[in-house]
Amino acid sequence: MYLLDMSVGANIVLSSIIACNASVKFGYAGLIIAPLICGTIIGLINGIVYIKLHISSLIVTCALSLIYEALSVYTTNGKNVILSTEYRAFGDYPVNLILALIAYFLCAFILKYTKIGIYTYAIGSNEVVAKNMGVNVSKYKIVAF
């Protein structure tokens, strides 16, 4: 069965809002660490709800996406959140491109050379065979979210 995560956009929005708010209080450290923690918690919630309730991942993540979007609006009181110019490392150059490339290579490394990546490929190829090989399928599905 295919696993689809429809909450990625809401995850990015909520993590970005948290990052902007954290940068005001904690500087660069908050700007980097806060969205990582927020995204991890959101992924953990998605995975646990999917595994425990045995509902399609499409439905679970779509419903949770609405909750995350509502939290985003509640957090900002419906107003725009803008990152301070002092935290824009390369001025107007899209630092997102650099960060996206770093994230891509990191994820590619994890998927190709670690146990988590190998198990993820095994579960994606054939979940029954992966389970028969001794892979804790539920655990690695949660990690994948």
Tell me what each language-model feature is.
Residues 17-22, 44-48, 70-71, 104-109:
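Alpha-helical transmembrane segments of multipass membrane proteins
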Residues 26-65:
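Alpha-helical transmembrane segments within multi-pass membrane transporters and channels
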Residues 2-4, 26-27, 53-55, 114, ...:
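Membrane-helix interface residues
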Residues 13-17, 39-40, 65-66, 104, ...:
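Residue-level recognition of pore/gate-forming positions within transmembrane alpha-helices
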Residues 1-25, 48-51:
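Single transmembrane alpha-helix segments in multi-pass membrane proteins
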Residues 16-17, 63-73, 129-134:
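Small-residue-rich segments of transmembrane alpha-helices in multi-pass membrane proteins
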Residues 53, 57-115, 140-143:
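Transmembrane helix-bundle core of multi-pass membrane transporters
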Residues 29, 33-35, 41-46, 93-145:
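Helix-loop-helix "hairpin" substructures at the membrane interface of multi-pass membrane proteins
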